[in-house]
Curated annotation (Swiss-Prot):
Coiled coil: none annotated. The keyword Cytoplasm does not apply. CDD domains: TBC1D23_C-like. Keywords: Cytoplasmic vesicle, Developmental protein, Golgi apparatus. It comes from Xenopus laevis (African clawed frog). This is TBC1 domain family member 23. The gene is tbc1d23. SUPFAM superfamilies: Rhodanese/Cell cycle control phosphatase, Ypt/Rab-GAP domain of gyp1p.
């Protein structure tokens, strides 16, 4: 059991937030008598008013008989005292009816989401709290389009294929799609199939995660555990197999939940962050879904953003690491490619199958060697990159299918291909060029030349190199306060004398490990190697991507809300710095940095709720490895967090803040970090 006395005391004291609850519980079971308060905090409904107060209570929907029947069936299945049944039925039917009316939802027969009330009923909540909890769960944890052939289930199939291609292929041949067996899993968060006790144990952990995407990994474990049974049984009856899969959660016991979450966390850590970041619009409270034209039903495999690929190339240690396979024709690859990419010409698959087979064999051997040698190019996860133009990428899908048919796990495609990679680097490094990110077989690095309106772009050679590879792109960008005119960016091979520019301090693969990945002029450096696990302060010279950020999701859907002044006045807060949080896209959010003896918190102000903020970030001071500032903008401070190991430092997060009097702020933070490090060393 958790420290029940500490938890009870914290809850009684008031002002308790989810972070405090997590720190006390630390993954252990929630005491039954405290579950109500813990869940209300986790769902952000503590102290919320009665949403039904303005409703006249009319149960007059066209589908009301259907709602009444399903609510009655729900009550009959629960262990409820006879004298409570009538009042409870009224509460449940009112909650369902008001939800349908307020959200303009037409109730469907046997809707799986009605079973979300099963574990809530056991808490014996008043009607207002019952509705608030139900509403919060529906908005935050039940995805849009959670129905037959819905987008959430197409995404789940891609996740299953990523980790268990053999099982996915088997189910595909049977034409068994995830919506046929997992609709009630997702629609009820397992409440449809599991007992109330088991469901409450699952929700105790799940609500503390505060991440709706974690449900995907709990569902994945359901299938992983059923794999041997599904593949081993000779079931010709499709419906029988679907029923077998659908009932998998029914066998769960309370004692299984700890292992369930441990396994889910493992698969979560082995999945590209793009899985979550690129599909945030599946969840949220907005009545109008974010515009997302991605047709996941036609996707051959998971897509990974180029920003994540670049960040993975910088990291060391555990985590998702990509072995990038460039599938463009040889002349395009030779003109310029990601420095760590292996070349596999997809055209060979039809033009010269024998040579293609040899190339695949070489690819797998190179991948193995790069992992064993600890090369920066090494990674278990194969990510295939095309040009980004449909007419040029006709064969890359055939290459992907080739690997998937061999049940190769961890297969993905670079979203937008090489064009997206170039555009991403251009957007973030227009003044400084590509540095060592993109190389050519001649050893010269591609760079970006910018020309003002009306100027013509003249290549450094007679049209060869990067200019012949890609079209000119027009990009618009902003400075701090002035809109700069559109510039035409011409990508050319830089054969002239290199200009002075900031280079990227990125360790490249050892030449001996993967000869074809690097050119003879690439430098080899291993920053941080042999350095003590302490942070450094200096001018910002490195390329960063804020891949850990999750702000693209509605904050209302995943962040806990706190009172800013209450947090500032906490006795353990040593420093408070008003600031703006700055994202890679230039967006700024009024925020507050709070420094305690051991941690730094970022509270992002809620513009629509004065005096309150979301806990946007919480970082241990012991994990700060570097603090940098821009020469031209010294008030723009970048914090890098990570952990050290035998081979160096692995960067786990990057945050940027615009801080008035930044010098005083960084000095105070530095002093507190030194105290933490001194304490750790002693």
């Amino acid at each position: 059991m958790c420290r029940e006395a500490d938890l009870s005391e914290a809850l009684e004291a008031g002002g308790c937030d989810l972070e405090t609850v997590r720190n006390i519980i630390q993954g252990r079971p929630v005491p039954c008598d405290l579950r109500t308060k813990v869940w209300k905090i986790a769902l952000n409904v503590s102290g919320k008013g009665d949403s039904l107060a303005s409703w006249d209570g009319s149960l007059d929907l066209q589908e009301q008989p259907l709602i009444h029947r399903d609510c009655q069936n729900l009550i009959d299945r629960l262990s409820v005292a006879e004298e409570r049944k009538t009042a409870l039925l009224e509460d449940i039917e009112s909650v369902v009816t008001f939800y349908c009316k307020s959200r303009n939802v037409k109730y469907q027969e046997d809707a799986s989401w009605i079973h979300l009330l099963n574990p809530l009923v056991g808490l014996q909540l008043p009607r207002s709290d019952l509705y608030n909890c139900f509403y919060a769960i529906m908005n935050k944890y039940i995805p849009r389009d959670c129905n037959r052939k819905g987008k959430p289930f197409h995404l789940f199939r891609l996740l299953l294929q990523y980790h268990e291609p053999e099982l996915c292929s088997f189910l595909d041949t049977k034409k068994i799609t995830p919506d046929l067996y997992a609709l009630n899993w997702f629609g009820s968060l397992f409440a449809f199939h599991c007992s109330v006790e088991v469901t409450q144990a699952i929700w105790d952990n799940y609500l503390q995660q505060a991440d709706p995407f974690f449900m995907y990994f709990l569902m994945l474990i359901m299938l992983v555990n059923s794999k041997e049974t599904v593949l081993g049984q000779d079931m010709d009856d499709k419906e029988e197999l679907i029923k077998c899969l659908e009932n998998t959660p029914s066998s769960l016991e309370v004692e299984d939940i700890e292992d369930l979450f441990s396994l889910a966390q493992y698969y979560y850590s082995k999945t590209p962050a793009s899985f979550r970041k690129d599909h945030q619009s599946l969840f949220g409270s907005s009545l109008i879904a974010f515009k997302d034209d991605t047709d996941l039903s036609q996707a051959l495999c998971l897509a990974v953003s180029v920003s994540e690929i670049l960040q993975a190339n910088q990291q060391q240690g555990d985590g998702v690491r990509f072995f990038v396979v460039d599938c463009r024709p040889a002349e395009q690859y030779n003109s310029g490619h990601l420095s760590t990419a292996f070349h596999l010409d997809s055209d060979l698959m039809l033009q010269n199958p024998g040579e293609f087979a040899l190339s695949v064999k070489s690819l797998l051997e190179a991948q193995k060697q790069s992992i064993e040698s600890g090369s920066i190019a090494g990674g278990e996860h194969l990510c295939f990159m095309g040009s980004g133009r449909d007419e040029e990428d006709m064969y890359i899908n055939m290459v992907l299918a080739h690997f998937l048919q061999k049940n190769k796990e961890y297969i993905s495609i670079a979203k937008g291909g090489f064009m997206a990679l170039q555009q991403h680097l251009a957007d973030f490094n227009m003044e400084n060029g590509y540095g060592h990110w993109i190389v050519s077989t001649s050893g010269s690095h591609s760079s970006i030349s910018m020309y003002a309106d009306g100027d013509s772009a003249v290549a450094a050679d007679d049209g060869k190199g990067m200019k012949s590879l890609v079209n000119k792109m027009t990009v618009a960008f902003k400075t701090k306060s002035v809109n700069v005119k559109d510039k035409v960016i011409s990508f050319i091979e830089n054969t002239a004398t290199p200009v002075d520019r900031i280079t990227f301090n990125i360790p490249w693969p050892e030449r001996a490990s993967l000869e074809r990945h690097v050119s003879s002029s690439d430098r080899v450096g291993k920053p941080y190697r042999g350095v003590k696990p302490v942070f450094s302060i200096g001018d910002e010279e490195e390329y960063d991507t804020d891949e850990v950020d999750s702000s693209s999701m509605s904050d209302d859907d995943r962040k806990e809300i706190v009172n800013v002044q209450t947090w500032i006045n906490k006795p353990d807060v040593k420093h408070h710095f008003p600031c703006d949080e700055v994202k890679d896209n230039g967006h700024r959010f009024p925020s507050h940095l709070l420094v305690t003896a051991t941690h730094m918190y970022c509270l992002r102000e809620i513009l629509s709720k004065k005096g309150f903020a979301y806990i946007q970030s919480r970082q241990a001071l012991s994990t700060v490895v570097k603090i940098t500032s821009k020469k031209k903008h010294p008030e723009l401070i970048t914090f890098k967090y990570g952990s050290s190991n035998a081979s160096g430092v692995e960067i786990s997060a990057v945050e940027r803040y615009l801080i008035p009097n930044a010098g005083d702020a960084t000095k105070a933070i530095k002093q507190q970090i030194m105290k933490v490090l001194d304490a750790l060393e002693s």
